[in-house]
Amino acid sequence: MPTVKFAIPKGSIEEATFKLLEQAWQSISGRGRTYRIKLSDPEIGVKVLRPQEIPTYVQEGFYDVGITGKDWVRETKADITTLLDLEYGKVKQVIAVPETLAVEDLTGLIEEFAAKKRPLRISSEYLTTTSAHFKSNQAYQKHFGELDPMIITPWLRVGENKNVQIFLSFGATEAKPPEDVDAIFDIIETGTTLAQNNLKIIDIVMESSAVVVANKSSLRNTKKREKIADMIALLRG
């Protein structure tokens, strides 16, 4: 039975994460054949999961430690401790609109649609963050007060403000405007994909990178805390 359960991300930061693990523990087995990875240290049990899931699973105690993105820690509002910024997987969360739309910032976007009395439609994988960011804007508050933007998914519809609608994206978010939505809330590395889809950035919301997070109860357990400290030392290099 491993002392520490460790969740690592599948997807865009998977390759960089495995390189880091190889530097720290030398011997790794199981990659590509299974979601359960073996390190040279038998006291660490490793499983590969989607980064979106890791903050919540760490919070719930399914895992003691995990690697995920700052963006997903914020999106899930998980009650966990960030131990280390790994400084890879760097992306920016942005709001982008079609180049033909004559607005230059989020305030201008909200004012434009409010003046025309048209619902503003946004596509995003980050429903919580998108809603909170729009609600924090002064133009939003001026027109809609404390109303929550309407969040629309295939199985859920919440929020009172039908004039600002956030649609859950399952990927290829940049392809949605202008036919399906008016704006997107997405992550970028270089911005090339946005330009290829005739989109322009009007707001940079946050910068994100891969981080090591831990369950708070695990950090209060002496044996786990000592093992986690050893892991962090190895990950720092």
Task: Give the ranges of each region predicted by the language model.
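Domain-level signature for soluble enzymes in the chorismate/prephenate branch of the shikimate pathway
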Residues: M1-G237
